[in-house]
Amino acid sequence: MKTQAMEKINLVQAFTTFSDYWSPRVAGDINTSQIKLAKFKGAFDWHHHEHEDELFLVVSGTLRMHFRERDIDIEAGEFIIVPHGVEHCPEALGDECHVVLLEPNTTLNTGNVTNDRTVHALSRI
């Protein structure tokens, strides 16, 4: 059984440890899910996740989640859950957006799409 030390993580400090965009970092594990930190800039790619729901918690900036039928803006301190199978395209409004993701550890950042933004091996904070 995998155990993890009980340590607090300062989100503001953790976001200063990396600078690349759209490349999530694992900050912690909860059973079969992971807490990931990511910096978003501009728009990502349209995609969906066949089996995984995703939670996007905005720490700073504004995230616009595009869906085929509408857009939803998520401000700092707000979150949105995107159910599996729902096509979506995240976009950071303004300069950049810092986001905490809570999702199953099987979740590929680009979902059903494989391209140069796909991250197969995630780094840890």
Stretches with model-predicted labels:
Residues 3-15, 28, 89, 93-125:
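Double-stranded beta-helix
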Residues 11-46, 52, 104, 111:
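A short glycine-rich, His/Asp/Glu-containing loop-to-beta-strand
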Residues 26, 55, 64, 71, ...:
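Short, surface-exposed charged micro-motifs
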Residues 39-40, 49-67:
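Short, conserved beta-strand element in jelly-roll/cupin
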Residues 42-45, 70, 85-87:
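Short beta-turn/strand-loop junction motif enriched in small, turn-promoting residues
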Residues 47-48, 91:
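Short glycine/serine/proline-enriched coil/turn segments at secondary-structure junctions
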